[in-house]
């Protein structure tokens, strides 16, 4: 067990450390208070970054080539207009007689002998289903 003198020494050391930290915190707060507000500092840093990037972009040789190519283009672009929009494909009803397809009960064919599904085997064929 720790004796009373050791505990007193440790408590006094902690107290002195706490007082020194308190004075350090006050000094830091005073130093921060004397500086520009955070918003102004951020705006200054952002402006510096934008200026540096603008300078890099303007000094880039590829940018100069692009600007020269754009400068050599005519002011008005001549675009050919399509002659006439066609009506497109005539997708009306299929006019070819589709005998032999479709289901008679659906009315999709005029042929009464049209194939139906499921397939019905004619008489004499082996029953597969």
Curated annotation (Swiss-Prot):
**Mind telling me what this protein is named?**
Virion-associated protein
Q: Name one Pfam family in it.
A: Cauli_DNA-bind
Ranges for region Capsid binding? 122-129
Per UniProt, the keywords (alphabetical) are: Coiled coil, Disulfide bond, Host cell junction, Virion
| Superkingdom in the source lineage | Viruses
Description of how the protein assembles with itself and partners: Homotetramer, through coiled-coil domain. Homotrimer when interacts with icosehadral capsid. Interacts with capsid protein, and with Movement protein.
Which parts of the chain are coiled coil? 1-31, 38-59
Q: Which organism is it from?
A: Cauliflower mosaic virus (strain NY8153) (CaMV)
Molecular function GO terms recorded: DNA binding
Q: Which GO terms describe its cellular component?
A: host cell plasmodesma; virion component
List the InterPro entries hit by this protein, alphabetically.
Answer: Caulimo_virion-assoc
């Amino acid at each position: 067990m720790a004796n009373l003198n050791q505990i007193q020494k440790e408590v006094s050391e902690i107290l002195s450390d706490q007082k020194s930290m308190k004075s350090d915190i006050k000094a830091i707060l005073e130093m921060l208070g004397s500086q520009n507000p955070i918003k102004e500092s951020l705006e200054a840093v952002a402006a510096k970054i934008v200026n540096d990037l603008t300078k890099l972009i303007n000094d880039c040789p590829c940018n100069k080539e692009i600007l020269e190519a754009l400068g050599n283009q005519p002011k008005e672009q001549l675009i050919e207009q399509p002659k006439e929009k066609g009506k497109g494909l005539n997708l009306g009803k299929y006019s070819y007689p589709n005998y032999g397809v479709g289901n008679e009960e659906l009315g999709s064919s005029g042929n009464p002998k049209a194939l139906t599904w499921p397939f019905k085997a004619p008489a004499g064929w082996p029953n597969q289903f």
